[in-house]
A protein has these predicted regions:
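Terminal, membrane-proximal amphipathic helices
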Residues: 1-85, 104-224
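Selective recognition of hydrophobic, aromatic-rich stretches within alpha-helical transmembrane segments
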Residues: 92-100
Length: 224
């Protein structure tokens, strides 16, 4: 009995730690989100960026998104561009400059595609879906983890119908995933990117990753 009680206490402590880390991670994501939406000096707003590509493509959303993705992939594989960004955006201490710079570009790309789909970037659910897209997280799986049964693929419309407490739990899961993947150890073990300070960016990895993220964003925000 004593052993079982100890195991339960240890399990609860582990869950509590994950919640705390998740909240910490979500706060960091919030800072990255605000910074990406605000942009660096002289950059267009995300809304203006989305409108520019829509205008260039005659209002065809998927075509505009594909064109946007190609441009962002180019940015994420250009060492000079990422190095320049590193000095202009404020990054959490646990994130290397190249990772933060790539995420800045990727968040703006996802957000612009969301705008093309008619979504507001001030909507909390949209913000959560932006990061689920960035982190390659299937929201349907997260819903199951927090006790919500759903037979269908999770959508923005479904999330909007759920209580705020559920969204909070989802955000904690996203925050924990973020710290696990992009914490200092995670960068080395999972992403294997050489810091910009060393003068090299793993352009091939950024190209593949950014392209995949863009494709996911189209599925989430444009293919309803």
């Amino acid at each position: 009995m004593g052993t079982e009680t100890t195991q339960i206490i240890d399990l609860n402590a582990e869950k509590g730690k994950e919640v705390q880390e998740g909240e910490k991670g979500w706060k960091l994501l919030g800072k990255l989100y605000d910074g990406a939406l605000k942009g660096i000096p002289g950059s267009k707003s995300v809304e203006a960026l989305a409108q520019e590509y829509l205008s260039n493509c005659g209002g065809k959303k998927e075509q505009a998104a594909e064109q946007l993705i190609r441009m962002q992939v180019t940015k994420c594989t250009t060492t000079g561009f990422l190095t320049g960004l590193g000095g202009l955006i404020t990054l959490p201490a646990t994130i290397t400059a190249d990772i933060g710079s790539s995420m800045y570009v990727q968040i703006r790309m996802i957000a612009a595609i969301a705008v093309m789909g008619g979504y507001s970037l001030q909507d909390d659910v949209v913000k959560s879906m932006v990061f689920a897209t960035l982190l390659k997280v299937e929201v349907g799986n997260l819903l199951k983890q927090v006790g919500v049964k759903t037979a269908n693929r999770a959508s923005l419309q479904l999330l909007k119908k759920l209580p705020g407490t559920v969204l909070t739990k989802i955000n904690q899961k996203l925050g924990f995933r973020f710290l696990t993947k992009f914490g200092q150890k995670g960068v080395i073990n999972l992403v294997k990117v050489v810091p910009v300070a060393g003068g090299v960016v793993n352009g091939g990895l950024n190209l593949v990753e950014t392209k995949a993220i863009g494709k996911r964003a189209i599925k989430v925000f444009l293919l309803k």
